[in-house]
Structures are given as structure tokens and as C-alpha cells.
Amino acid sequence: MIRKYRYGTPFNTEALTEKIETTEGVLPYGEVSQEEGFVFTYIMDEDDIVYGLGEANRGINKRGYCYISNCTDDPVHTEDKRSLYGAHNFIVVSGKTTFGLFFDYPSELTFDIGYTRMDTLKVSCENADLDIYVIEGENAYDIVKQFRHVIGRSYIPPKFAFGFGQSRWGYTTKEDFRAVAKGYRENHIPIDMIYMDIDYMQSFKDFTVNEENFPDFPEFVQEMDDQDIRLIPIIDAGVKVEPGYEIYEEGVKNNYFCKREDGSDFVAAVWPGDTHFPDMLNPEARKWFGDKYRFLIEQGIEGFWNDMNEPAIFYSSEGLAEARELAGKFAKDTEGKTHPWEMQDKMLSIANNPEAVSYTHLRAHETLSD
């Protein structure tokens, strides 16, 4: 059985494919406080196990640590990290009392699972605008089955995707890929896929192929396929700002990119330099960007590596300007007024700085609410 409890005015994430009516009253488990944002608290039994949160750090039992749903482009997965690439706000408390909780909330959400207090599960967020789904069943398996039913059937990859794939930055020509395939075959190591990083593109532009390095690209795709190896090209979430580039021109013309508060297209740097980001909260933009994959599908490509979509940014123009200004002050400072640690913190924070992209979320939220 699944019950929905509503707090405030939630943002419609479209996470569920089935509509569940709101249940009146209080949650059957734990307590809720809305004095400072939103806080859910549940006292755990000594033997309770907490499962869930998708691809996160540490073991299967999430008890004993603090996790933050805040998608982050961080390749260093040390145990002290609290956020990784994805955010899956679903947990199952398994013990004398077993139940599942799904927090339908699109922004930063903190799961303190026996970290601050060993017996306390605490889930908190800044704004009390969310839906909570309470899932009860015969056991943890039944709870997960019910949850998967309401979020829709998962995508089932093709058979080759369950095989081994080789991925490495720096393969720039056909010969590089042929050498990799040959090495695996000669050493009797199975291989089903070779990933193509950004070097296959023309100037790192989405939905392009470097024709100098990959002439007759469809024939090369078929050559690899004849060896039962699929080429899996990368597609980044950033579209290069370049007048005359078809994807850029179409996105600007049709307002498909994320906006700044003043209505202009948000600019930040990733691999191609200055880029715009498709507004995936806009259904028309989603369809437009998705249709562009046909460019590669029609050349024989059967799978893709979607990257940089946390979103990941190297720097924004505002962040870079602030860093340059501070660097100038630091260079001229002969009295030690600008501390070296301040300089270090500024340089380290220009990448993936949430302050640089927060207004795109706000703008999108306002647009969809109108």
C-alpha cells in the first residue's frame, strides 16, 4: 500500500507515472517539523537496517552516515563524500517495523541516518514543499516492487550493454580504436563496446563528427560492429556557443536553453569553452535535443554515453571574473591583506559552484509555475 502526504506546494518532478491521491492526517511513522524548513525524524530500533539512496558511497546498509541528495560532478569517490552524480530519495527501513519512504523533492535533501545520533533517522530540506510517499508491504522486496511500479518500468539495455566496455580519454583516430580492439582480441579478453570520448567530435561540438580523423564514419561503425564491438559516443549536456553551429542557432532561436534571471541564455564553460545548457524541464527542449541523436543513430550508432549532466560546469563568467579580480588583488598585495587560503578557496570553487547555476533552477521553476 502506498500513501502520499503533501507539505506546502511541491514542484512537480514527474517522478511517478501513476497518480496517487493525497492522504490527510499525519505520517504513520516518525514526526515532522516545519519550524525551520522541513525535518522528518524517526527513532530507529537497534537492529534496523536502512537500504536505498541509489548509487551512493559506503555499503548497502546506509546507517551510520550522512548523505546529501545534491547531484555533483565529483570523480573522487572517497568515503567522506556525501554527494555523488545521482540523487535517489528512496529508502527502506527494515527491521521489526519495515516501511519505505520516497521524498519527492527536487532540491538539496539531507539524509542523516544515525550519523549525528545513532538511533535517529533525520531527513531535512530548506523548503517545506514536498510530497512524501509511505510504502508498506510484506517485506522489503515487496516495498521495492511497489515503488518500481509507480515510478514506471525501468529501461532495459540491449544485451551488448551488459558486456565489457573500454573507456579512455585520448582515442582520436580510427587507428586508435582499431589498436584497442586488436589488443583485446590478441589477449583473448572479451570486449563488447569501446567508448568514444569528446575527441571524436568536431571542436567538441555535440552531434558532430571530426571528418578529418573519422572519414566515412558509418563504414567505420560497421567495421567495428562486424567484430561484435559497438562504438559508444559521448554526448555532453553543454552546447558550444558558436554562431553558425546548427544546434546552437536552433536552441537560441527557440529558447531551448536555460536562462538567467534577466531572461538571457545562461553561459558557462565546459569542454568546448562557453556553452549553453538545454533546459530539460522544457518538454519541447527535451524532444528537440533527443531528436538530434538521430544524427548518430542513422550512421549505425546503437548506444550513447550521456555526460556532464549533473549539471557539471568548469566555471561561469561571473565566477571567473571574481577569481581574476581576487588574483589581481593578491598579486598587488604587499601587506598580506589577501590571505593565500582565500585565494585557494576562490580558485577551487569556480567549478560546479551551486551559486552560479541556482538562478537557472529558479527561472525554470518560475516558468513552469506560470
Question: What are these model-predicted stretches?
Answer:
Residues 1-158, 168-169, 174, 181-186:
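Catalytic and substrate-binding clefts that recognize carbohydrates or anionic sugar/phosphate headgroups
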Residues 56, 63, 71, 88, ...:
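Surface-exposed loop/turn and secondary-structure junction residues enriched for glycine/proline
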Residues 155, 159-303, 308-317:
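Aromatic-lined carbohydrate-binding/catalytic grooves of carbohydrate-active enzymes
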Residues 318-324, 328-359:
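N-terminal leader/propeptide and maturation segments of large enzyme subunits in energy/redox metabolism
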Residues 360-367:
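Conserved small/polar residues in nucleotide/adenosyl-binding loops
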Residues 370:
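Gly/Pro- and small hydrophobic-enriched strand-loop and loop-to-helix capping segments
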